[in-house]
Amino acid sequence: MAAAHYENFPVASLLLPSESRNHIAALYAFARTADDFADEDKYEGRRFQEINRWEKGLLAASKNQKAPLMLLAFANTLKTFRIPLLLPLNLLKAYRMDLTQKRYKTWKDVFYYCKHSANPVGRMVLYIAGIREEKLHRYSDSI
């Protein structure tokens, strides 16, 4: 999946410890797929439905129920590193926000968006890296 997209993930993933790569790849696949639902033309007219379906699948996977393999892999990452389910759910909220809001009028609005978009990703990466201290998570949020 990573090689098919235009981001820096394929190169960056080589810099990660080998034991983290599959988990970072699972996070990337989860987020990239949801982002595609919000952005790609082929999902026009059904973007909310696809994001909602993805969330439903994540919730099922997190309960060891039938779900797409990609979500089962990501749910395994969440369990392995005790990542709060709220983080990926917040990220899905950000993708929904992308569908209704293109520009933000105030910094407060921008920070609220970041609370649901960039911050959860940074925090999930920190969990995978074994960093659980809330103070360090807040530092990540402020980047």
Question: What would you call each of these model-derived segments?
Answer:
Residues 1-143:
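Acidic catalytic motifs of isoprenoid enzymes
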